């Protein structure tokens, strides 16, 4: 990997530090689907879209070591700044350790994420002045996919710091401070008709459902 001072156009940020109570003692990102950890599936599907910068945000050095031992590929590990703080902690750490202008931000549990959809999101933000491109299921109800979205680094970093300073820890509060293009998911169906790209694994039962 290049060092953190090297600028690049695209980066991938994968948030792996969250604890999932529904997975009990298991670490969700290392839970196995069809022979590979969920995190491995996720990295393998998106890394080629931004091969110069893939960052995995882990909750601590213990999890980081486990990831390093079990996951292959060219990626860097950063550690959440705060304990039990939700996705903002890992996202803040990752954005402070990269110089990429635009970053895809995703969870570690998206084994079917579509790299062509990711490419589409990067193309939209590169051709615009928006701070973020966030897929949207329903604008009125605010059903968004903020953990399957592309963000411009600088304004997003500022927004995260503002939100944390206000005592909040929700990613939706960050999105609310940004100039966001809400991309209707129907515009993605031409690439991914069934929108499998948004499938995330929340429970062991869902994991079992996708085994083959």
Show which residues each predicted segment covers.
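Nucleotide and nucleotide-moiety/phosphate-recognizing core
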Residues: 3-197
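SAM-dependent methyltransferases
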Residues: 2-11, 204-212
């Amino acid at each position: 990997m290049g060092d953190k001072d090297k600028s690049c156009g695209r980066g991938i940020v994968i948030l792996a530090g969250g604890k999932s109570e529904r997975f009990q003692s298991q670490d969700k990102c290392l839970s196995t689907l069809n022979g590979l950890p969920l995190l491995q599936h996720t990295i393998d599907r998106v890394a080629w879209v931004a091969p110069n910068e893939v960052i995995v945000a882990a909750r601590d050095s213990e999890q980081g070591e486990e990831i390093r031992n079990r996951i292959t590929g060219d990626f860097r590990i950063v550690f959440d700044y705060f304990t039990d703080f939700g996705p903002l902690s890992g996202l803040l750490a990752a954005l402070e350790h990269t110089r990429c202008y635009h970053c895809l931000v995703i969870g570690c549990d998206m084994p079917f994420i579509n790299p062509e959809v990711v490419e589409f999101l990067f193309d939209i933000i590169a051709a615009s002045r928006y701070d973020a491109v966030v897929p949207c299921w329903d604008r009125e109800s605010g059903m968004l996919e903020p953990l399957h979205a592309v963000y411009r680094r600088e304004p997003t970093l500022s927004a995260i710091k503002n939100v944390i300073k206000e005592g909040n820890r929700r990613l939706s509060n960050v999105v609310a401070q940004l100039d966001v293009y809400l991309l209707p998911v129907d515009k993605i169906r031409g690439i991914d008709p069934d929108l499998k790209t948004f499938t995330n694994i929340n429970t062991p039962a869902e994991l079992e459902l996708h085994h083959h």
